Design a protein with these regions (language model features):
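Positively charged n-region of N-terminal signal peptides that target proteins for export
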Residues: 1-4
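Bacterial N-terminal signal peptides
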Residues: 6-16
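Residue-level hotspots at or immediately adjacent to binding/recognition sites across diverse folds
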Residues: 20-337
Length: 337
């Protein structure tokens, strides 16, 4: 078998179709920092960012409409979950009442304020939806426990008893992918800080949690697990590092093959801090983005190849088409991966 390995590698190179691995910039019509993006289809996507800004396209990004949520110019929308060209959630992150959750059902003309963080010391980090009605929201620890909220109707959110946090442990609001869901009930989220670098896992809609350690660096409040994604029920990738050291490859990636019970670092790390990772089911590829560049893997995250040097914060894919967003209103499309 060992002697056949070069043959298998050659076959992989021959049968795998050529893939145009690149981001093509688009015009966002805004200059604010963008942190969230959510693709609905090949034509419909939403994005979000600072100063109460949200964006939408219905023509594949040929045109993006940028708007500000009325009365929310102070909001930093770190997360967006789009459900159609009409319906979307916006999550703002900030201390106490600066953490808010909005929803639109009319394409973004009117936004309903669903919830304001009731704790002045709280800070919301991310939101994810299992389906149009069932979702979960994650916040930094309050009184020693992570702040977990869930919904079963898409409108009313109920606070759960979150899992206990270690001292100086928290989550990150860098790309709205530090919280990840799969199937009908499973959720994972990553942590950072000097006690962080851990991944929590729930199989019952966020009611109870188990936790595991990862090899991602967590030697400062700036370092830890920033993003998690799964390709199936067992195989996942977590990325991160230290966002203050964007070119440092130490502790930037971990892989699990048992649904997050254990995590291991591959032999090849990512070349620097990465804030988001995504799996493209259509092409069986993994993509990672961060402030120092983008990378692609075709072997489950074990090895990576840089393909773009621009700095992006977040990304979202539908099939083989997706968008990435970044500082200064940066937005780009990857088409036909």
């Amino acid at each position: 078998v060992k002697g056949l390995w070069p043959f298998f590698v050659l076959c992989e190179l021959v049968v795998r179709p050529a893939i145009a691995q690149s981001w093509t910039p688009q015009t966002s019509n805004t200059s604010v920092a963008l942190r969230g993006v959510s693709a609905v289809s090949e034509r419909i996507a939403w994005a979000s960012g600072a100063k109460g800004t949200f964006l939408k396209t219905t023509d594949g990004g040929v045109t993006w409409t940028a708007s500000v949520v009325p009365g929310a110019a102070d909001a930093d929308f770190r997360g967006v979950i789009a459900q159609s060209d009409k319906s979307a959630y916006l999550l703002s992150s900030g201390a106490g009442p600066l953490s808010r959750l909005y929803k639109a059902n009319d394409g973004g003309v009117k936004w309903d304020l669903l919830m304001v963080n009731p704790n002045p010391k709280g800070f919301w980090d991310g939101i994810a939806m299992w389906d149009p009605l069932h979702g979960i929201l994650l916040g930094d620890p309050v009184n020693g426990r992570f702040d977990i909220w869930t919904t079963s109707d898409g409108v009313t959110w109920v606070q759960q008893k979150g899992p206990p946090a270690l001292p100086q442990e928290g989550a990150f609001a860098a790309s709205n992918t530090g919280l990840s869901v799969r199937g009908a009930h499973e959720a994972w989220f990553g942590t950072g800080g000097v006690s962080g670098g851990r991944v929590f896992h729930s199989t019952d809609d966020g009611k109870t949690w188990t936790v595991s350690k990862t090899p991602l660096r967590h030697d400062s409040e700036n370092a830890g697990v920033f993003s998690i994604a799964f390709s199936d029920a067992r195989h996942g990738v977590a990325v991160g590092g230290d966002f203050m050291k964007p070119g440092d490859a130490a502790g930037t990636i971990a892989i699990t093959e048992d649904a997050g019970k254990t995590w291991a670092a591959p032999a090849m790390p990512l070349p620097g801090y990465r804030s988001a990772v995504a799996y493209l089911d259509a092409t069986k590829m993994w993509i990672a983005v961060g402030t120092s560049g983008s990378d692609v893997s075709i072997d489950g995250g074990r090895t990576w190849r840089p393909f773009n040097k621009a700095g992006y914060n977040a990304m979202s894919f539908v099939g083989s088409i997706g968008w990435a967003v970044g500082p200064g209103g940066m937005i780009a499309i990857a088409n036909g991966w």
